Amino acid sequence: MQSLAAEQFLPRVDRKFDRDNLHNVSENEKHILIMNGWFCHNPVDCFPPSDSIVPVFVGFHLYGEKTQDLLTPQCIEYFKKHGPIGCRDRRTMELLAEKGIDSFYSKCLTITFPKRTKEPVNGKVFIVDADTIPIPQSLYEGAIHVTHSVEDLFGDEVKAALAKKLLELYRDEGSLVITTRLHCALPCISVGLPVIFFGDSSDSRISLLKDLNVQINRMPNKYLRGIYRFVNEVPRNREWGKRFRKVCVPVFMRYVDWNPSPIDIKQEKEHLIDATRDLIAQKISLSESIKS
């Protein structure tokens, strides 16, 4: 989803690079690369990227035990040289600012997908990587269950095609999305879908949802999830699962708004689109001046 969002801002895509091997890229020509996302899978071979890369930092994210691998003196110097750094969350912005790096809170590029022009007739409920969440029977019945987890045996082109098809499916046929996935929630909000999100509101990875006025519903406790899994996944218990969803879910999950309205993020979307276009234009201008 993040790559699809980035490609919207480019006139064309000449090359694609392995996110985890940017340090070792060796090209005769320089390539502008939108650096949105998390780059700590393999920081040694990723950062700092090679001189063949002209980075546009927007939606950049730091999180986890490998964060310090991207805050070495060499990396800090790289960030200062190629700033400003647009950050997906306030915590990343603060970490960079503490190092004297020019940074700003951009949010994520996946909020820039165009809003759909019409809502579907008899739209579908999509439950995305939320099968352990107890859901009311009225929503569960007829819902489509989806996962964003894709086996590594599929190549990047297949994964990109699947992501595009999923986004089109949500946009064209969805009436509601229930998910635990940030990069399902944000694109769906962007295209105009109502979203019910479950997660940890204290987690900086998803903190931008609060700034978009998205309710972050706490995950049900492990005992409730265990009971739900037992009555929901074992075939002989399915009738009990239906009763559980009808009777118990409205009681135990009453803190959830099961009928949310779409959230208007027009202002945030336009601001990020303008900022991203400006950053790209600056990099293009800089690259052309270096050539001349």
Language model features with spans:
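Active-site anion-handling motifs in enzyme catalytic cores
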Residues: M1-S292
